[in-house]
From Swiss-Prot:
PROSITE patterns: D_2_HYDROXYACID_DH_2 (PS00670), D_2_HYDROXYACID_DH_3 (PS00671). Transmembrane segments: none annotated. GO terms for cellular component: cytosol; plasma membrane. Catalyzes the NADPH-dependent reduction of glyoxylate and hydroxypyruvate into glycolate and glycerate, respectively. This is Glyoxylate/hydroxypyruvate reductase B. Its EC number is 1.1.1.79, 1.1.1.81. It comes from Shigella sonnei (strain Ss046). It is found in: Cytoplasm. NCBIfam families: PRK15409.1.
Length: 324
C-alpha cells in the first residue's frame, strides 16, 4: 500500500501524476482548522505534506501523528514551526536553489524601475501628461557606477552582485554573517559593517530570511543613516523591515525611493500609504513568479518529498539531523 500524502496546493498535471506514482494523494484547499477537522481521518493517516503559503504549526502536527516529512514549494520556511517539526522528527524540505536567478532578476528590475522611475512615468504617459518634450521633473537617476549595498550575501545576493558588477559596473558593498571570499574575488565586493553599508550605498538591497534576529532589523535608526538620495529595495521578507519606519523615512525624505516585493502583511492593504507614493514601486511578492521557475520549484518540491519519504536527505533539507 502506498504511503498517504496531503497536497494543499495545485500542481501541474505531470507533477501530480509523478506524485501519484509514489503515494496515495489527497488534495485539500488549505490547512485551516476547518479543513483539518473536515478531513480528520486523512490528516491522521498522512505521512507526507506538500504545498506552500500555509502555516504548519504544533497544533496541526498534533492532528498528524504519522507525518514523516513536509515539503514546501518555496525557499523560505518562516511559516513552519521548525522546532515542533524537529521535536517530532519530521523532515522539512524546501527549494533553495531553483529560484536564485529569477529572484535576482526581480531585484535588478526593482533597482532599475525605482531609479529610472519607470512605473511612475509610464502611468503619466497613460494619463495623457506627455504633451511636450520632457523636462527635469521626469528625470530619474543613473544606476551604472553607483554603489550597491547588499545585506545578505547568499545565493540570491551573489546572483544580484554578478548582474550589478558585470552589467552595470557597480561597486559592491555587502554585510553578512561572515566574509564571502568568492564575492570578494569575483566582484571585488567589500565586506563592511551595516552602518558603513547604509552610509555609503546608493542602493540598499535587503535579501534576508525572517528569523527572531532579523525581525524589524531595519527601522527608523537604519533609514536615518542612509543617504537622502539612496533607494531601498526589499525582496527578502517583509517583517524584516519596520514598515511604519519605512513609510516615515519616505515621507520625511530621509531616503529617495523604495522598491518592494514583500511587506509586513500580505496582501498589502489598499489603504497603505506606500500605494500613494509615486517614489515607491510595490509589486505582489513576484520574486520567483515566472512560469518556468514556479514549475521548477514545484518539481523540486515533489522530488524532495519522494526523497524524504525514502530516507534520502542529502540535499534541500532544513533539519536533516532528525533522520539520524
Amino acid at each position: 500500500m502506498k504511503p498517504s500524502v496531503i497536497l494543499y496546493k495545485a500542481l501541474p498535471d505531470d507533477l501530480l501524476q509523478r506524485l501519484q506514482e509514489h503515494f496515495t494523494v489527497h488534495q485539500v484547499a488549505n490547512l485551516s482548522p476547518q479543513t483539518v477537522e473536515q478531513n480528520a481521518a486523512i490528516f491522521a493517516e498522512a505521512e507526507g505534506l506538500l504545498g506552500s503559503n500555509e502555516n504548519v504549526d504544533a497544533a496541526l502536527l498534533e492532528k498528524m501523528p504519522k507525518l514523516h516529512a513536509t515539503s514546501t514549494i518555496s525557499v523560505g520556511y518562516d511559516n513552519f514551526d521548525v522546532d515542533a517539526l524537529t521535536a517530532r522528527k519530521i523532515l522539512l524540505m524546501h527549494t533553495p536553489t531553483v529560484l536564485t536567478e529569477t529572484v535576482a532578476d526581480t531585484l535588478m528590475a526593482l533597482v532599475l524601475s525605482t531609479a529610472r522611475r519607470v512605473v511612475e512615468v509610464a502611468e503619466r504617459v497613460k494619463a495623457g501628461e506627455w504633451t511636450a518634450s520632457i523636462g527635469p521633473d521626469w528625470y530619474g537617476t543613473d544606476v551604472h557606477h553607483k554603489t550597491l549595498g547588499i545585506v545578505g550575501m547568499g545565493r540570491i545576493g551573489m546572483a544580484l552582485a554578478q548582474r550589478a558588477h558585470f552589467g552595470f559596473n557597480m561597486p559592491i558593498l555587502y554585510n553578512a554573517r561572515r566574509h564571502h571570499k568568492e564575492a570578494e574575488e569575483r566582484f571585488n565586493a567589500r565586506y563592511c559593517d551595516l552602518d558603513t553599508l547604509l552610509q555609503e550605498s546608493d542602493f540598499v538591497c535587503l535579501i534576508l530570511p525572517l528569523t527572531d534576529e532579523t525581525h524589524h532589523l531595519f527601522g527608523a535608526e537604519q533609514f536615518a543613516k542612509m543617504k537622502s538620495s539612496a533607494i531601498f529595495i526589499n525582496a527578502g521578507r517583509g517583517p524584516v523591515v519596520d514598515e511604519n519606519a519605512l513609510i516615515a523615512a519616505l515621507q520625511k525624505g530621509e531616503i529617495h525611493a523604495a522598491g518592494l516585493d514583500v511587506f509586513e502583511q500580505e496582501p498589502l492593504s489598499v489603504d497603505s500609504p506606500l500605494l500613494s507614493m509615486a517614489n515607491v514601486v510595490a509589486v505582489p511578492h513576484i520574486g520567483s513568479a515566472t512560469h518556468e521557475t514556479r514549475y521548477g520549484m514545484a518539481a523540486c518540491a515533489v522530488d524532495n518529498l519522494i526523497d524524504a519519504l525514502q530516507g534520502k536527505v542529502e540535499k534541500n533539507c532544513v533539519n536533516p539531523h532528525v533522520a539520524d
